[in-house]
Amino acid sequence: MPLRWQIDHAARFVHIVGEGPVTIEQLEEHFDAIAVANAMGYAKLFDASLVQPRYTDDDVMRMGARLSAYTANLPSGPLAVVGQSEEVLITFRRFVNISPSDRPARIFRTEAEARAWLKSQSGHL
């Protein structure tokens, strides 16, 4: 599975790991699962170090509409993404730019940096 996630309700934390090609449909599935679990407001760590994004500009716009629907009714917790490839950096910027949420979001080179920042943002981890 290209995307897998674990939700820790006690810690109010979602850990997402991606590997290989990831499509917009797989991202939608992950967002839906997190929303259904009432975890949208939790701190999120997305390790995209091994992700190969596979979506078009139209896909990104479609995801923007979906994120608008989520954030209209659900809180958004801080997001830390781990990744170093140019592809992941570009994709992160595109999603942050289209997201209607004003949540804090940053990209990091290491998981340790991401976790430290999330802890400073949410007090959890």
Where are these regions (language model features)?
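Amphipathic, Lys/Arg-enriched alpha-helical "gate/interface" segment within cytosolic domains
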Residues: 1-125
